[in-house]
Design a protein with these regions (language model features):
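Beta-sheet entry/capping signal
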Residues: 30-31, 57-58, 95-98, 125-127
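Short, surface-exposed "cap/lid" segments of acyl-processing enzymes
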Residues: 1-69
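Conserved acidic catalytic loop of the alpha/beta-hydrolase fold
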Residues: 68-70, 80-97, 109-113
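Domain-level signature for proteins that mediate thiol-based redox and metal-cofactor handling
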Residues: 34-37, 42-43, 70-85, 116
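Alpha/beta-hydrolase-fold enzymes
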Residues: 93-94, 111-225
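A short secondary-structure junction signal
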Residues: 17, 43-46, 109-111, 138-142
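Generic beta-sheet signal
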Residues: 61, 99-101, 130
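Gly/Ala-rich beta-loop-alpha elbow adjacent to hydrolase catalytic centers
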Residues: 100-108
């Protein structure tokens, strides 16, 4: 109930024509893109998916907003995350290439390590980590330092909220996306201020293309779970 595995359909006839082949002869590699579960939706990876589509059968994890998952479905923790990733890799079969983008790096590595330990025949052909903090202690940033300075109870009391009654997941305890978004913005505060200032100036100048790109980015970036 916490994730859907999406497969992107491709125009095989157009691909075959472009390659001078029969559609039935196309055997492109399978690529599983593990999207972050860090407040945003998988749509943030639209550009990544588009880049893989011409040469790959692309699958992506579409994590469900926890406020839409009833409490009766149980909790979702790190062990569940690892189990979900392993189950999806197994479902796609051997020879799949796994690409974890940012946050899912550690749980994806754990899932594949468990598959290797068990000599699972469905273990992937390759794994790629893009911007993933495998060992965050090696390059500590502000969030790392905050995690070391605060006790566990502080995070529980200040960052975990209860889903309100208007949603199917009412009473579920979650870390809401708006808090993560606030952290993201504060880490690059000057950059976001400059972006909006430039946006304002471009509107005055009548630069429609640039303003449309700005709106499109922030419509996506500000949409959180």
């Amino acid at each position: 109930p916490f994730c859907n595995l999406l497969h992107f359909n491709r125009d095989r006839a157009a691909l075959a024509a472009a390659r001078g082949l029969k559609a039935s002869s196309i055997r492109d590699p399978k690529v599983l893109i593990v999207a972050p579960m860090s407040g945003h939706h998988a749509t943030l990876l639209r550009g990544t998916v588009e880049a893989f589509l011409p040469d790959s059968e692309v699958y992506v994890t579409d994590w469900i907003d926890a406020r839409h998952v009833p409490v009766l479905e149980g909790r979702f923790d790190l062990e569940d995350y690892v189990a979900y990733v392993r189950e999806m890799i197994t479902a796609l079969g051997e020879d799949v290439h796994v690409v974890a983008v940012c946050q899912p790096g550690p749980p994806t590595l754990a899932a594949i390590a468990l598959m290797a330990e068990d000599a699972d025949p469905a273990r992937p052909a390759s794994m790629t980590f893009m911007g993933s903090p495998i060992d965050a202690r090696k390059s500590p940033t502000v969030p790392n330092k905050l995690a070391e300075e605060r006790p566990f109870e502080w995070f529980r009391d200040n960052l975990i909220y209860t889903v309100p009654a208007m949603y199917p997941g009412t009473m579920r305890r979650v870390y809401p996306g708006f808090l993560q978004l606030t952290g993201f913005i504060n880490m690059n505060y000057d950059r976001h201020v400059d972006a909006h200032w430039n946006f304002f100036n471009r509107m005055i100048d009548g630069d429609g293309d640039s303003t449309d790109k700005h709106r499109a980015f922030y419509d996506e970036y500000l949409s959180v779970m």
